Design a protein with these regions (language model features):
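Phosphate-coordination loops involved in phosphoryl transfer and adenosine-cofactor binding
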Residues: 94
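Short amphipathic alpha-helical patches
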Residues: 49-50, 81, 88, 105-110, ...
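Short, glycine-/small-residue-rich phosphate/pyrophosphate-handling segment
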Residues: 97-137, 150
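N-terminal beta1-alpha1-beta2 submodule of the flavodoxin-like/Rossmannoid cofactor-binding fold
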Residues: 1-88, 145-164
Length: 165
């Protein structure tokens, strides 16, 4: 099972728009990928809500796509909290992950991607080599969809490679 995680809890974020684009592009490759947004993530500790998320989403997933906005040179703390609450061995060990950075700045959350790569390696995850930092995100989207052909092709190529990974 593939799961795309929009790693911010901000409502109406560009991150979620990008995650939906990834979901659509996976569908074009006949790969069903569920989308999990942290917009409604409310757990501050292991609770019934979190246990359900872990059992129904995290544990069954074999391949993850993390869409990560840049927050203070890294990725959102709410995503780190979710990871910290989880059973690391069941939720993350030996699973595959594709990393995507999203930012209005020039680097496309490259530092956050690097930081997450280190975390994923610590959690024994296999990180796909082609990481995509998408910079100037406000200029990349119109009506919640990518508008630049070069970005569309980069995303589609990344997805095709990840499917083979």
């Amino acid at each position: 099972m593939y799961t795309i995680i929009s790693t911010t809890n901000r409502i109406g974020s560009n991150t979620l728009k990008v995650a939906r684009q990834y979901q659509a592009f996976f569908a074009e490759e006949s790969i069903p990928a569920q989308l999990y947004s942290l917009e409604n993530f409310t757990s501050l500790q292991r609770d019934q809500h979190f246990d359900k998320t872990e059992q129904e989403i995290l544990i069954p997933t074999k391949k993850f796509v993390f869409i990560m906005p840049e927050y203070n040179g890294s990725f959102p703390g709410i995503f780190k909290l979710m990871m910290d609450l989880s059973d690391i061995k069941q939720s993350w060990y030996y699973k595959k992950v594709l990393l995507v950075g999203v930012a209005n700045g020039r680097a496309g959350n490259l530092r956050g991607i690097d930081s997450m790569t280190n975390m994923c390696h610590y959690m024994k995850m296999n990180v796909y080599h082609e990481k995509l930092p998408i910079s100037g995100i406000s200029n990349e989207l119109e009506n919640d969809a990518f508008i630049k052909e070069s970005t569309i092709q980069a995303v589609k190529n990344q997805i095709k490679g990840f499917i083979q990974f």
